[in-house]
Amino acid sequence: MLSITILFLLIAEGSSQNYTGNPVICLGHHAVSNGTMVKTLTDDQVEVVTAQELVESQHLPELCPSPLRLVDGQTCDIVNGALGSPGCNHLNGAEWDVFIERPTAVDTCYPFDVPDYQSLRSILANNGKFEFIVEKFQWNTVKQNGKSGACKRANENDFFTNLNWLTKSDGNAYPLQNLTKVNNGDYARLYIWGVHHPSTDTEQTNLYENNPGRVTVSTKTSQTSVVPNIGSRPWVRGQSGRISFYWTIVEPGDIIVFNTIGNLIAPRGHYKLNSQKKSTILNTAVPIGSCVSKCHTDRGSITTTKPFQNISRISIGDCPKYVKQGSLKLATGMRNIPEKATRGLFGAIAGFIENGWQGLIDGWYGFRHQNAEGTGTAADLKSTQAAIDQINGKLNRLIEKTNEKYHQIEKEFEQVEGRIQDLEKYVEDTKIDLWSYNAELLVALENQHTIDVTDSEMDKLFERVRRQLRENAEDKGNGCFEIFHQCDNNCIESIRNGTYDHDIYRDEAINNRFQIQGVKLTQGYKDIILWISFSISCFLLVALLLAFILWACQNGNIRCQICI
């Protein structure tokens, strides 16, 4: 927020012995030797006294764990954390605003795939918590708690913590399983379950007896039925088989039915879904530090009050809008017209029409004067404050127009959804183009308004002084007035503060004006008289020449012959 402390500065210079002419008072505005270029609606390069950068280009090389809660998945992605893979125990009961997935995350259990991976990932991320509720499932005449050498814990064969691998009983039986669970709670439940795909028919019968197997999971509104796809696949962690994981959401009052004759990877419970939570996920290698920031990107955290940033299009939290421009400057001061280097303070006194004043440090507008008591400079409180009041809060208003608590994450799609991904990227690129254009236009509008306001206040101040002085002074055309009466420092002060009474000095001013005009004419009158004098001189010269010729002819000194 722009704030300027207005102080009246009066610098007395010289003495009455150094100046004997008429008092002069000039109006001017602040200037600096090197201003800042900004863009307006009508000009790409306008120099102003001060401007503020609106685009943040700096970021912290770390993620800030406050005030947003961050959970580092480390070697586990969010899906492995939900399944309960080895090495993911640190995620049990974890709660987050932003789940940090690392590019180095790896699978550590039986090789698997999730046909609707991104949807499951999004549901888990948005939920903001791993709140797993264990349930009792009555499976009949089958073996439970199957394990695999691909899933080691403490060098022992194991399996996903939150899943139960069902196989045939010791009596080689895998009878039809038909199990129903009712959601009698007040929240939605997320069940994650799987289907095992053996690599051979022999493995199928050795594990489940029945070939083919089948898994069907139903609710009142949906049904998913899967027949295992038996076949050899590349070996991963010593396994050629695969598990496909699916998920089902059961709303309050709904039921879920598990029906299988083999190959079911059964849930041990469900995840409690929080419909009010609005968490998200960020894939980045940036470490978590000890800083404080409400905005995170895949390149690090941003701590700024600026409304725009060009660090990353992937941002989470209370972040500036991403724009393509590297710089957008908001004018917070008036148009800058630097003072000529060769001009002293009063070497050739001039007002705002010719240039600005670099010595006017305590205000935007002010006065310079020269009289019998010396010279001086003073800032004008009223006009400066009027301009500040209109500009003050401009940055805050601009932030309000652009600030929105939102997150923009990089969306991922399966390979079969390539066209959707291309369309999504096109839409995101279009949104960024529009925001970049809107940001540039908005800043240009604000800059135009700022310059117009400051120019207007200068004109208002000049008009106020002109109305005060009236015929007691003459406008010199450069922002200065020559005063035709004695005007000491008190008189000058009355002009500045608006208490000047022209009637007091009127007679003296008129008398002095007539005396001065008898000797000293303004530049406009000089030009007219010079032209008249030149014309008369030419006329007299021609008349004398003709008179001489006539006289000479009469005396016989000149003979004229006209031949036809």
Swiss-Prot record:
- Please report the PTM annotation for this entry: Palmitoylated. In natural infection, inactive HA is matured into HA1 and HA2 outside the cell by one or more trypsin-like, arginine-specific endoprotease secreted by the bronchial epithelial cells. One identified protease that may be involved in this process is secreted in lungs by club cells.
Q: What InterPro entries has UniProt attached to this entry?
A: Capsid_hemagglutn (IPR008980), Hemagglutn_HA1_a/b_dom_sf (IPR013828), Hemagglutn_influenz_A (IPR000149), Hemagglutn_influenz_A/B (IPR001364)
The site (Cleavage) lies at 343-344
Q: Which UniProt keywords apply?
A: Clathrin- and caveolin-independent endocytosis of virus by host, Clathrin-mediated endocytosis of virus by host, Disulfide bond, Fusion of virus membrane with host endosomal membrane, Fusion of virus membrane with host membrane, Glycoprotein, Hemagglutinin, Host cell membrane, Host membrane, Host-virus interaction, Lipoprotein, Membrane, Palmitate, Signal, Transmembrane, Transmembrane helix, Viral attachment to host cell, Viral envelope protein, Viral penetration into host cytoplasm, Virion, Virus endocytosis by host, Virus entry into host cell
Complexes and interactors: Homotrimer of disulfide-linked HA1-HA2.
Q: Which cysteines are joined by disulfide bonds?
A: 26-480, 64-291, 76-88, 109-151, 295-319, 487-491
- Protein name as it appears in the record: Hemagglutinin
Function of the molecule: Binds to sialic acid-containing receptors on the cell surface, bringing about the attachment of the virus particle to the cell. This attachment induces virion internalization of about two third of the virus particles through clathrin-dependent endocytosis and about one third through a clathrin- and caveolin-independent pathway. Plays a major role in the determination of host range restriction and virulence. Class I viral fusion protein.
The opening ranks of the lineage are: Viruses, Riboviria, Orthornavirae, Negarnaviricota, Polyploviricotina
Give the family, as the similarity comment puts it.
Answer: Belongs to the influenza viruses hemagglutinin family.
**Glycosylation site residues:** 18, 34, 178, 310, 497
Per the record, lipidation of type S-palmitoyl cysteine is found at 553, 560, 563
A single Gene Ontology CC term: host cell plasma membrane
Extracellular compartment spans: 17-527
Q: Name one GO molecular function term.
A: host cell surface receptor binding
Q: Name any Gene Ontology BP term.
A: fusion of virus membrane with host endosome membrane
**Other observations noted:** Major glycoprotein, comprises over 80% of the envelope proteins present in virus particle.
- SUPFAM superfamilies according to UniProt: Influenza hemagglutinin (stalk), Viral protein domain
On the Cytoplasmic side, which residues? 549-564
